[in-house]
């Protein structure tokens, strides 16, 4: 676990980078099932202990050509009653690596703080130079870690081979090309941190807990903040109508232990719904859509499906609302690809996004784009997306860290629980970027666990 940030950066193993628990799952476990979180923590510690006991097996397999059984036996014997000794040695290597990087980083940031008070041009030039230095120091620190880690596993210091004079120009040539590339990257990163303004989308129709999710009452408040879209959740009712509801079971919001598909629309809209200290009635989709059109507020409508839905649910939905949705510029999304297919079959001009709660493999679909949980999103996914004409929305962006990551990866839209915070972040990034802060954020990528 301690080595993941370093190993992932050195090896760039695709599936190792996938070992990430989505943030929304972590938050849900912490909030609802803390005991499950405790069990996961214990299992992680157990896995870490096992990895310590077996870490000397790999060098035996690769360098000594021993069998798996012999290598495992060797590692277990070597670490017997000495686990803490090796843990502290590993920790010390990691600490030294980070200290090495931090000590080089401090004068860079200090000089940038002083230069940021001068003209924009001077500050930008030094910022690019400092960006190049940070990238070089980053790779120097990784090299230092790799040398120390391999020496630790093998018990031997790496031999220093004498430099050959004919390689001198090649080394400087490679270094020069790398610095030019880093400088170009730094210019783009510092001068245009937001190359195109992302759409800002209200999550479940609320912002900063200003009301009850998915209700007309909250829509009226949230629309005043001028989001580009308001994300909503729609489910079918027992009588084939449509209601505004996110949860599969409505007990948490209404106190009634039932699914939306168990009650008629009339029964649902008579229920009181409470959240964030606010109280109102459950909203029908008709009432919500009419209010949105009245306010000229565009919606991102998520269709939530269940086994209790009627077979022709989407056909009826599109026949009833399709024309209105298209005329008013609304968009759709769903976790169920059958919904995507049926929307496109009805009218391919209606934007519809496929929701991906986890980034595993890149899907090949006809969707307008993808709505991705941000914490597992990576450059590999984005690079493949650039080869298509599809868009990317990310959720849920509620911090400067998640905003920075989304901007860096070029997200087309950000779904957030705090519209004003994200709007402010976009304004600062476009109009008054702080080079010291941007350099610091770039440096902190080295510490990304």
Q: Residue ranges of each PLM-predicted region?
A:
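Hydrophobic alpha-helical membrane segments
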Residues: 1-198
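Membrane-interface segments at or immediately adjacent to transmembrane helices
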Residues: 189-239, 243-244, 251-253, 259-262, ...
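Structural preference for beta-strand elements that scaffold enzyme active sites
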Residues: 197-201, 229-231, 298-300, 329-332, ...
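Conserved, mostly hydrophobic/aromatic
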Residues: 203, 222, 233, 268, ...
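A cross-domain feature marking catalytic cores of carbohydrate-active enzymes
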Residues: 204, 232-234, 301-305, 334-336, ...
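Amphipathic, non-transmembrane alpha-helical secondary structure
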Residues: 216, 220, 224, 282, ...
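Metal-dependent phosphodiesterase/phospholipase catalytic core, i.e.
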Residues: 246-349, 442-448
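C-terminal active-site rim and adjoining tail of enzyme catalytic domains
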Residues: 354-449
């Amino acid at each position: 676990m301690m080595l993941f940030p370093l190993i992932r950066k050195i090896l760039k193993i695709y599936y190792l980078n996938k070992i990430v628990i989505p943030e929304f799952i972590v938050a849900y476990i912490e909030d609802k099932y803390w005991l499950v979180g405790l069990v996961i923590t214990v299992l992680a510690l157990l896995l870490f202990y096992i990895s310590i006991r077996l870490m000397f097996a790999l060098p035996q397999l690769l360098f000594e050509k021993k069998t798996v059984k012999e290598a495992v036996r060797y590692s277990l014997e070597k670490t017997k009653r000495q686990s803490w000794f090796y843990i502290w040695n590993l920790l010390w290597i990691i600490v030294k690596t980070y200290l090495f990087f931090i000590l080089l980083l401090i004068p860079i940031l200090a000089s940038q703080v002083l230069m940021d008070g001068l003209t924009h041009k001077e500050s930008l030039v030094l910022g690019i130079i400092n960006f190049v230095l940070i990238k070089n120091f980053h790779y120097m620190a990784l090299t230092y870690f790799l040398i120390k880690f391999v020496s630790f596993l093998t018990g031997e210091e790496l031999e220093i081979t004498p430099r050959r004079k004919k390689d001198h120009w090649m080394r400087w040539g490679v270094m020069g090309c790398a610095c030019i590339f880093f400088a170009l990257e730094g210019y783009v990163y510092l001068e245009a941190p937001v190359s195109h303004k992302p759409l800002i989308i209200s999550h479940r129709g609320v912002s900063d807990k200003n009301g009850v999710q998915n209700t007309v009452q909250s829509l009226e408040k949230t629309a005043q903040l001028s989001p580009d879209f308001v994300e909503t959740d729609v489910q079918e009712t027992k009588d084939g109508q449509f209601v505004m509801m996110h949860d599969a079971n409505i007990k948490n919001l209404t106190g009634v232990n039932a699914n939306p598909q168990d009650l008629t629309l009339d029964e649902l809209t008579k229920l009181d719904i409470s959240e964030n200290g606010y109280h109102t009635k459950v909203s029908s989709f008709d009432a919500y859509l009419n209010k949105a059109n009245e306010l000229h507020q565009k919606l991102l409508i998520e269709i939530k499906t269940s086994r209790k839905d009627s077979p022709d649910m989407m056909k009826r939905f599109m026949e009833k609302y399709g024309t209105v949705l298209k005329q008013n510029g609304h968009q759709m999304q769903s976790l169920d690809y059958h919904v995507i297919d049926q929307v496109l079959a009805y009218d391919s001009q209606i934007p519809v996004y496929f929701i991906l709660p986890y980034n595993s493999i890149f899907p090949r679909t006809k969707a307008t784009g993808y709505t991705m949980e941000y914490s597992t999103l990576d450059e590999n996914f984005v690079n493949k997306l650039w080869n298509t004409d599809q868009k990317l929305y990310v959720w849920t962006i509620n911090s400067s860290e998640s905003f920075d990551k989304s901007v860096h990866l070029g997200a087309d839209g950000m779904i957030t629980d705090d519209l004003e915070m994200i709007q402010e972040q976009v304004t600062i990034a476009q109009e008054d970027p702080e080079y010291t802060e941007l350099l610091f954020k770039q440096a902190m990528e080295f510490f990304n666990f």
